[in-house]
Amino acid sequence: MIQQESRLKVADNTGAKEILCIRVLGGSSRRYASIGDVIVGTVKDAIPGGNVKRGDVVKAVVVRTAKECRRPDGSYIKFDENAAVIIKPDNDPRGTRIFGPVGRELREKRFMKIISLAPEVL
């Protein structure tokens, strides 16, 4: 459950380490984002020489949340941390590698490139 001012770990190799959620996309009164939802964020921590710099405003898709997410079969999935992958305007990832597992919900939301790059889909 990601909302404004939530901080997320970045799970790709763009050079960003942490982003702060500015807005949850998908309606004017939308408050929370879950796995597979797109957010707008600002880079709070980055490594030198990376593709993105501290202060850059980026779009990202949430790939892991600490709050459990209910699935249609009645099961729940939750992770140890909140994490996101920075994306381009065409919803392809900006980096070339994804670190850590991602939720299966990304497949339903058509983020196939992220699914194929991820080491594990839970």
From Swiss-Prot:
SMART domains: Ribosomal_L14. One of its GO terms (biological process) is translation. It comes from the Bacteria. Keywords: Ribonucleoprotein, Ribosomal protein, RNA-binding, rRNA-binding. Pfam families: Ribosomal_L14 (PF00238). Disulfide bonds: none annotated. PROSITE patterns: RIBOSOMAL_L14. GO terms for cellular component: cytosolic large ribosomal subunit. Transmembrane segments: none annotated. Gene3D superfamilies: Ribosomal protein L14. GO terms for molecular function: large ribosomal subunit rRNA binding; structural constituent of ribosome. InterPro entries: Ribosomal_uL14, Ribosomal_uL14_bac-type, Ribosomal_uL14_CS, Ribosomal_uL14_sf. Part of the 50S ribosomal subunit. Forms a cluster with proteins L3 and L19. In the 70S ribosome, L14 and L19 interact and together make contacts with the 16S rRNA in bridges B5 and B8. HAMAP family: Ribosomal_uL14. Binds to 23S rRNA. Forms part of two intersubunit bridges in the 70S ribosome. Belongs to the universal ribosomal protein uL14 family. NCBIfam families: rplN_bact. This is Large ribosomal subunit protein uL14. It comes from Mycobacterium leprae (strain TN). The lineage of its organism: Bacteria, Bacillati, Actinomycetota, Actinomycetes, Mycobacteriales.
